[in-house]
From Swiss-Prot:
The gene is CSLA7. Its EC number is 2.4.1.32. This is Probable glucomannan 4-beta-mannosyltransferase 7. Probable mannan synthase which consists of a 4-beta-mannosyltransferase activity on mannan using GDP-mannose. The beta-1,4-mannan product is the backbone for galactomannan synthesis by galactomannan galactosyltransferase. Galactomannan is a noncellulosic polysaccharides of plant cell wall. It comes from the Eukaryota. GO terms for molecular function: glucomannan 4-beta-mannosyltransferase activity; mannan synthase activity. The lineage of its organism: Eukaryota, Viridiplantae, Streptophyta, Embryophyta, Tracheophyta. GO terms for biological process: cell wall organization. It is a multi-pass membrane protein. It is found in: Golgi apparatus membrane.
């Protein structure tokens, strides 16, 4: 059965595609009969004189200085021109048009998501309107104990010295009848000192009457998925109708369960209620500011659009409440990828379950405070998403409990465009092909692909992030750098290369408290090689070289300015400069 939201989503998607193509056509942008512009400009006439002249000058001799070159050098240059024009340029030209197609896919997808998101906001189509929601017994849980279901709160953690007290304390202070709430701490810590502290904290809350369970494992098999699976195997879990999950740095408000659980109670076809993330350290550096912009777009646009149209989106791994039955029917937690949360969400959706995203409910958390930590987090997510696409695509195709429109949305929009196309085209086109084009005059890149489409994506992003407008230039450069890592991660996941299933825990520093609540372990000084990111520095050298080449030999064009900025961004992040100062207040 096709839902009304799915039909509306399909209609909006068709309108977005039509609008994008119509705008491109009216601007004269889409004209495949001839290339509209060549980035780097220039023709063969300029190059045929400049390069041999330089070779001759560098080789020395009066004849070289006068512009002549030896027969040997001329022969080598002729070989280069032929190879460049006959092999390199045609190969890159194919890549250009593939990237153009991918770029159109991106802008249509972004237009669709933003249109839905803006529409939901404009008409006030709140989750409480789309789904039944009635408040429970409110402030006095004791009076309404009979209608309160049994809920378990799971907190997986691994050596979370700086934040373990915050998450455990917030979970234990949730407004819910004491006899209807179980707090389960899943501690995979390998440090005995930290493990002891976490256990003591659990005992402290237990002495206050909280039903808190401390669960450990003999090994970290399956990492977070393995810990959650272990928690679900406990006998007392069988009596719990709903499972709330929070990572160790998340601090839910006391009324979190009162606002989320009623959605599950009154809508038997709903499996998941996802809340939005809020951040306690989003103003500490330029790095955290651009991260916040990234997550704001994800929640405001992508999650909202998926929830409003197809009642499907990816579980964010934390700050959500699951129906226990849905988890079990989907096969429970699996550790086959590094995105166990997305894996469970897709499998549950294939069984016909619906999801609700509630953007008004926000849960405080911590952003990665270092560039290295953020890169490891993004690599895990990008690699895991692409790898899951490889493993579950066929299951989506043959699923019988979802509509054809929903299958299309999951395979095309959710997986193909976001997990594969987006990281590929952004890196290949803007960080490789465009810089190389300044040295290959035979290569033509349509101006609509490197000007109109990026501008359209920028406007679409800004519309839903107006408060972050002053951060936009930094965000553009930062995302340019991150595309290299995300493309490598996507390829690793798709091809299951070495390290595709490697799990790395994101380091937290407990930024939400002014004074550290526990004594920190002694800090070790990082070695120089640990503070330098060679891939980023390598790309910066490449981009700056291309920019300089463009400036010297094609000074009439202004593309070198963009390349210099990209190269500078790569260079700064290559040396781990993330703007740790009060900027853009």
């Amino acid at each position: 059965m096709v839902e009304a939201g799915e039909i509306g989503g399909a209609a909006v998607f068709a309108l977005a595609a039509a609008a994008a193509l119509s705008a491109a056509s009216s601007l004269g942008a889409v004209d495949f009969r001839r290339p509209l512009a060549a980035v780097g400009g220039g023709g063969a006439f300029e190059w045929d004189g400049v390069v041999p002249w330089l070779i001759g000058v560098l080789g020395g001799g009066d004849e070289a200085a006068a512009g002549g070159v030896s027969v040997g050098v001329a022969a080598w240059y002729e070989v280069w021109v032929r190879v460049r024009g006959g092999v390199i340029a045609p190969t890159l030209q194919v890549a250009v048009w593939v990237c153009m197609v991918m770029s159109v896919m991106l802008v249509v997808e972004a237009t669709f998501n933003s249109a839905v998101s803006l529409g939901v906001k404009a008409i006030g189509w709140r989750p409480e309107w789309r789904f039944k929601w009635e408040p429970l017994a409110g402030a006095d849980e004791e009076k309404g104990r009979g209608e309160y279901p049994m809920v378990m709160v799971q907190i997986p953690m691994y050596n979370e010295l700086e934040v373990y007290k915050l998450s455990i304390g917030a979970a234990c202070e949730l407004k819910w009848p004491k006899d209807k709430l179980i707090v389960q701490v899943l501690d995979d810590s390998t440090d005995p000192f930290i493990k002891n502290l976490v256990e003591l904290e659990c005992e402290s809350w237990a002495s206050k009457g909280v039903n808190i369970k401390y669960v450990t494992r003999s090994s970290r098999k399956g990492f977070k998925a393995g810990a959650l699976k272990k928690g679900m195997e406990c006998d007392y879990t069988k009596q719990c109708e709903y499972i709330a999950i929070f990572d160790a740095d998340f601090q839910p408000e006391p009324n979190f369960l009162l606002r989320t659980v009623p959605f599950l109670m009154h809508n038997p076809n709903v499996a998941l209620v996802q809340a939005r993330w809020a951040f306690v350290n989003d103003t500490t550096s330029l790095l955290t500011r651009v991260q916040k912009m990234f997550f704001d777009y994800h929640f405001k646009v992508e999650q909202e659009a998926g929830s409003a149209t197809f009642a499907f989106f990816s579980f964010n791994g934390t700050a959500g409440v699951w129906r226990t039955t849905a988890i079990n029917e989907a096969g429970g937690w699996k550790d086959r990828t590094t995105v166990e949360d997305m894996d469970l969400a897709v499998r549950a959706s294939l069984n016909g379950w619906k999801f609700i995203y509630v953007g008004d409910i926000r849960v405080k958390s911590e952003l990665p405070s270092t560039y290295g930590a953020y890169c490891r987090q993004q690599f895990r997510w990008a690699c895991g998403g692409a790898n899951l696409f490889r493993k579950i695509a066929m299951d989506v195709l043959v699923a019988k409990d979802i509509s054809l429109l929903k299958k299309f949305y999951m395979l095309y929009s959710f997986f193909l465009v976001r997990r594969v196309v987006a990281p590929m085209v952004a890196c290949v086109l803007y960080n490789i092909i465009v810089p190389l084009s300044v040295m290959i005059p035979e290569l033509f890149i349509p101006i609509w692909g490197v000007a109109y489409i990026p501008m359209a994506l920028l406007i679409i992003t800004t519309i839903r992030n107006p408060r972050n407008l002053h951060i936009m230039p930094f965000w553009i450069l930062f995302e340019s750098v991150m595309t290299v890592l995300r493309m490598r991660a996507a390829l690793t996941g798709l091809m299951e290369l070495s390290g595709f299933n490697k799990w790395t825990v994101t380091k937290k520093i407990g930024s939400s408290v002014e004074d550290t609540q526990v004594p920190l372990l002694p800090k070790t000084r990082k070695r120089l090689r640990d503070r330098i990111n060679l891939p980023e520095i390598g790309f910066s050298v490449f981009l700056i070289f291309c920019a300089s080449y463009n400036l010297i030999f094609h000074g009439k064009t202004s593309y070198y300015f963009n390349l210099y900025l990209q190269g500078l961004a790569f260079l700064l992040l290559g040396f781990n400069f993330t703007g740790n100062f009060a900027c853009c207040q």
